[in-house]
Amino acid sequence: MLGTFEEVLAMPGRYLNDHCLIHHDDKWHLFGIHGNVRRPEDPIAIESSILHATSPDLRAWTIHPNVIERTGHWPELTHVYAPHVIAHHDRFFMLYCANDELGTQRICLATSNDLFTWERYDGNPVIVPSLSWSKWPGFGLPSRNEARQLIGRHDTVGIKDHYRFIARTGGTYGGCRDPHINLMPDGRFIAYWVSRMNESFGHNLVCVAASISEDLVHWQEIGPVYSQTAWPLDDEPTLEVESPCVVYKDNRWWLFFKNGWWTHVTSSPSPFDFRGQEVHRLGFVHAAEVLQWNDEWVITHCSADPTDYEYRRSNRTRGLFLGRLNWPTGHHPRLV
């Protein structure tokens, strides 16, 4: 399950992580997490701006100035990351994530007329999970001092300690990240995002949740649409379900998501509930975006060498990769 990928955007000394692609005026626009390559023993990279690049063909890229820089004020105290962009009424809407000083994640909104200049929405954040089902600060999560006693300072530990912190505390501080927006047939928008569920629903549950909107500004939560038990720390590098990408094809909604080393895919006739559907392991792909281009289904990969399926030597060192899917009607997709 290692597909053939071509590196189409290399940034020596830097890496690309979760990203999105949108086509406008004969150009592809890429927005994504980026950062400087660090040694494994160094602190977790601070991803404090959003990269912007353009391409006529998904292969030759021009990098432009960053479009979003963290403000240093709530809710953007430490990180801004994981953007997703959609067009509506001659404007562009970007949902992106922001972290406060505790690492609590919230989804914010920015808008643009040209994809180059962006204005934040004054009412940010626009999406946070409901306390009725989510793990959220003050509701079953440790305080800052308790976290320090577990492993030391959360913002200055290495990557292995970070995952150990997640395992011991039952999750990140208030998970709400990695939005992916789709236009539904009825004209409303649905945003998928990831979080963790509280213990009343079961032990150590992670999920893809969703919210709906008529204007991309005001969002009504649906709640979890897919959930599973998190992977054990010793077996996989990523405890969370993350990086959802949803595609409508063959009268079904196809949900791609990352968990562990792998990207998985499931589908449902409803965009609101993927639970109980068959899940297929697609392969080693990180933060995949799936789209149709020139009559082909293509898939992106990022951050690591596509042959380094255990992230042993290349995590957060590589740029954007492009691969292909074999996706016949009536079947789930496979890497080419």
What is the meaning of each model-derived region?
Residues 1-336:
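Carbohydrate-active catalytic/glycan-binding domains of CAZyme proteins
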